[in-house]
Amino acid sequence: MLNVPSQSFPGPSSQQRVASGGRSKVPLKQGRSLMDWIRLTKSGKDLTGLKGRLIEVTEEELKKHNKKDDCWICIRGFVYNVSPYMEYHPGGEDELMRAAGSDGTDLFDQVHRWVNYESMLKECLVGRMAMKPALPKDYHEEKKVLNGMLPQSQVTDTLAKEGPSSPSYDWFQTDSLVTIVIYTKQKDINLDSVIVDHRDDSFRAETVIKDYSYLVHVALSHEIQEDFSVLVVENVGKIEIVLKKKENTSWKCLGHPQENHNSFIPKKDTGLFYRKCQLVSKEDVTHDTKLFCLMLPPSTHLEVPVGQHVYLRLPITGTEIVKPYTPVCDSLFSEFKEPVLPNNIYIYFLIKIYPAGFFTPELDQLQIGDYVSVSNPEGNFIISQLQELEDLFLLAAGTGFTPMVKVLNYALTNIPSLRKVKLMFFNKTEDDIIWRSQLEKLAFKDKRFEVEFVLSAPTSEWSGKQGYISPALLSEFLKRRSDTSKVLICLCGPTPFTEQGMKMLHDLNFSKDEIHSFTA
């Protein structure tokens, strides 16, 4: 489906590419880069064929536009004429044609739902699909605001039969506080399960329950202070969000419903939500990799779960470009630092700067105090995989090390059964090794941790392992304590590294349940 053209970052073999999916790319003609596409969209040329009109499109009308020179695609209810984009799409024309004349939302989400198609294709917008309203007509009645019971029409048949129990919410107040209570009916809820944003009068609380998302989204009836608190009662799955009133007056209602309020739908069907975060520091880690520190707004509660990634969004030459990155800790020894503010308001990223890239040079040019939009977390790593684990093996190449940082820290800190954590870290040269001294210090401090560095282009002075990922290296590295010991192997790097590694691990008789590949 729709993809950012070939000059985009991460490149097809980059270890920072999160959602590669193994798709093949088609070489683009000269003059068909992302910059060329942006120039075309800014040229004033009519790319829709409708001379600036927006129309309502029926299913019958959409089906008629299914040819390469007349191709309309629907994404999340909006219809685009992608015919002009055909030659600019690195996945090739055939990939786009899979959704010609139809709703391409599912195909789009399977490959790269993170791409900001609204910005990329805004000059190709034909109009909206003609469809019935998603919410019942009486949805905006005040009783729906006061009582957080989920309307039956919001629960799909599939969800009712197979998904988790439907959550609900309620609220109560004192003279100075308003407390919103979300009843998840799940016991594995914690602080990173809920994301809260308050902007102007808009209040948004999204709770992730397995593969579903429950949303409380209202325009508050009165003003509140910027800061709030979030509490989770884990054994009953109750979330309490405590807001501070600006004035000690009684509220007659919580507020008025906003888009998708009180909905409980598969997470894959939700759009990405962003908030602006401030760049507070940027420091060199290697010759081409930097540690970026972003600060969340005080009106946001967001904790990125272990093994998950977020999307960074920047406006570049008038178009919003989005790229996925996995947050890390600020250090492998964070406990020795004295934070100025609570740790959970900062998000850290190890990012390799590509001088010829499209995104990272712009990111690198940001000044302290500038803003970057950060999305809600995504990812399919399940932290319960680490429970009762005896041996954890980490295979990382380059910046494929980033998802390993939090996994490593969490395992050493929280898994009592853990016997050994071993990291095999592949790089080109010694200068490319991220946090080498920290890794060596950690291995000295905690005897459960071992690290091996493997270089593909070492100097003559290098005495460590050399080469690329191979069956011989892996069979020597991956030693089980016993045939019955519980192990997990995590793998992340450029696409060829990951694909080869997966095949080698299967050939070494490790089961699918014992392997996690960070490719989203």
UniProtKB/Swiss-Prot annotation:
Listed CDD domains: cyt_b5_reduct_like, p23_NCB5OR
Main subcellular localisation: endoplasmic reticulum
Gene Ontology cellular component list: cytoplasm; endoplasmic reticulum; perinuclear region of cytoplasm
Main enzyme class: oxidoreductase
Named cofactor requirement(s): FAD
Region Disordered, residue ranges: 1-27
Entry GO MF terms: cytochrome-b5 reductase activity, acting on NAD(P)H; heme binding; metal ion binding; NAD(P)H oxidase H2O2-forming activity
Domain CS residue range list: 164-255
Highest taxon in the source lineage: Eukaryota
Database matches in InterPro entries: Cbr1-like_FAD-bd_dom (IPR008333), CS_dom (IPR007052), Cyt_B5-like_heme/steroid-bd (IPR001199), Cyt_B5-like_heme/steroid_sf (IPR036400), Cyt_B5_heme-BS (IPR018506), Cytochrome_b5/Flavoprotein_Rdt (IPR051872), FAD-bd_FR_type (IPR017927), FNR_nucleotide-bd (IPR039261)
EC number(s) reported in the record: 1.6.2.2
Pfam families in UniProt: CS (PF04969), Cyt-b5 (PF00173), FAD_binding_6 (PF00970), NAD_binding_1 (PF00175)
Keywords: Acetylation, Endoplasmic reticulum, FAD, Flavoprotein, Heme, Iron, Metal-binding, NAD, Oxidoreductase
GO biological process, one term: glucose homeostasis
Subcellular location as annotated: Endoplasmic reticulum
Domain FAD-binding FR-type: 272-384
Classification via PANTHER family: CYTOCHROME B5 REDUCTASE 4, CYTOCHROME B5 REDUCTASE 4 FAMILY MEMBER
Designated name of the protein: Cytochrome b5 reductase 4
UniProt organism field: Bos taurus (Bovine)
